[in-house]
Amino acid sequence: MATEAPVNIAPPECSTVVSTAVDSLIWQPNSLNMHMIRPKSAKGRTRPSLQKSQGVEVCAHHIPSPPPAIPYELPSSQKPGACAPKSPNQGASDEIPELQQQVPTGASSSLNKYPVLPSINRKNLEEEAVETVAKKASSLQLSSIRALYQDETGTMKTSEEDSRARACAVERKFIVRTKKQGSSRAGNLEEPSDQEPRLLLAVRSPTGQRFVRHFRPTDDLQTIVAVAEQKNKTSYRHCSIETMEVPRRRFSDLTKSLQECRIPHKSVLGISLEDGEGWP
């Protein structure tokens, strides 16, 4: 009689291998927060097929799909069925060299060719315009003031020159007249004789002194002044002679003769100065 050997039903190895493979494919960014609890296996019990399908669905649900525009190659060590993606930082670092290769180097150099200009404010432009206008106005004022000053100085110079010329002409005339009068004084200061025609005249000086003397009708008024200076021992410059008769007459031109001035016999004449001093 054959004896029955004890049959040990061992758990299938395939299920354990599949479960470990599924657990390795699950992307766990944080092992503390996202930890999948595997069901405990018992000896002599086979795991249901539902567990395997759930693990695959969880893996497909949690794995983000890679961007379609940028293909990438898997490393040779990784299995083609693995669903663990690369980190986003690593993908961005892989994309940067490719973008740098696509962008030409001439563009960046052309942008940095010229330095950045400072910003131009409108206030600065207005202030500069105001300053330029003020400078132009001040320069115009200075030029006009200089022109006026030059004109005034020119007119003053011309007026001074004219006045000097006039004064020189007057002095020359006076010198010539005094020379002529001096020559006439030297020859006619003597009193005329009884045989000559003569006029008796009384002469009063500016100081009030009087003298009586005979003069010729041809004697001029300067001779009368010279005789008065000789008698009073003084000099009378810029003087004139007036008559005491009414109406009074005044003679400033001393070159005229007594006959020309129509001075009669026994007349009273007074010498007055042009500066206001004279007989009362």
UniProtKB/Swiss-Prot annotation:
Q: Which family does it belong to?
A: Belongs to the UBXN10 family.
Please give the InterPro entries that the UniProt record associates with this protein: Ubiquitin-like_domsf, UBX_dom
Q: What is the effect of changing M244A?
A: Reduced interaction with VCP
Provide the effect of E245A.
Reduced interaction with VCP
The UBX domain sits at 194-271
Protein name according to UniProt: UBX domain-containing protein 10
UniProt-listed Pfam families: UBX (PF00789)
* An MF annotation (GO) of this entry: ubiquitin binding
User: Which organism does this record belong to?
Assistant: Homo sapiens
Functional description taken from the UniProt entry: VCP/p97-binding protein required for ciliogenesis. Acts as a tethering factor that facilitates recruitment of VCP/p97 to the intraflagellar transport complex B (IFT-B) in cilia. UBX domain-containing proteins act as tethering factors for VCP/p97 and may specify substrate specificity of VCP/p97.
Q: Which UniProt keywords apply?
A: Cell projection, Cilium, Cilium biogenesis/degradation, Phosphoprotein
Swapping V246A leads to an effect described as: Reduced interaction with VCP
GO BP field: cilium assembly; ERAD pathway
Q: Does the keyword Phosphoprotein apply?
A: yes
State the GO CC annotations: cilium; endoplasmic reticulum
Quaternary structure, per UniProt, is: Interacts with CLUAP1; the interaction is direct and mediates interaction with the intraflagellar transport complex B (IFT-B). Interacts with VCP; the interaction is direct.
Name its cellular compartments: Cell projection, Cilium
Q: Where is this region: Disordered?
A: 41-94
- Residues annotated as carrying Phosphoserine in the record are S87
The principal location of this protein is other
